[in-house]
Amino acid sequence: MSDTPKIVCKNIWKIFGTYPQRTLENLDHSLSRAEVQAQTGHVIGVKNVSFEIKKGETFVVMGLSGSGKSTLVRCISRLIDPTAGEMIIDGEDIMHYNDAQLTELRRYRMSMVFQHFGLFPHRKVIDNISFGLEIRGVSKKERRSKAMEVLEMVGLHGWADHYPRELSGGMQQRVGLARAMAVDPEILIFDEPFSALDPLIRREMQDELLKIQAEVQKTMIFITHDFLEAIKMGDHIAIMKDGEVVQIGTPEEIVANPIDDYVREFTEDVPRYKVLLSLIHI
């Protein structure tokens, strides 16, 4: 992990509604999110969020349902346009990017892995994995070679010519991970990728991703609602509530010094040995 920031998020706001900019300009900052919605009919998805993500680190965004974590991460890729703020990647504010620049960013530098695998049922595993390379115009021989390489990396040797329906849920998620890795992105974004899996398979996938990250050292953003998963996966964790980041720190910092009762509720039942184990990366 480098000390150089890969992503810098500065004062990001996302307000949903008919007049988001006007609502932000006239906002009474003393009001809660529920009060803002009641008075204006607008919903604050992300509220004045700032942080840095270093090159090669795994940054976890953690919070309960409705906390704003998925909205925030979609702002990072500009799948959702923020209402205000700066989103700086490699020194460039992508808020100023046009459609062509955003397409290039998502096609060449950034990949996403979702909870629902999104595999093409009519395409074999190898063709699902190589899809991003196909979109880029990479030759069939080259994309098959790269797809086979990442297939091996995620532990699916021998499954190249099978269809998704022939795979278990855990195996399908491995294909989703391989598809994201195949395009060799600088940034990988995971939106609760393992939450639909059985607990045992979920732990296996967490371990697999930690193993891969130790090898490839990508910049990873990982969303979860599970605090144990957060402390296992993250170099740093941002905990969200009602659209705000309430605390950022390493797993051990957050467990040792929760900033308020909301964070303390996540940490109080976590045995110390769990934190220590989470820091032993594969």
Sequence positions of predicted segments:
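Helix-to-loop junction immediately C-terminal to a conserved catalytic motif
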Residues: S77
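A short, proline-enriched helix->beta-strand linker immediately N-terminal to the Walker B motif
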Residues: A182-E186
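ABC ATPase "signature
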Residues: I248-G249, N257
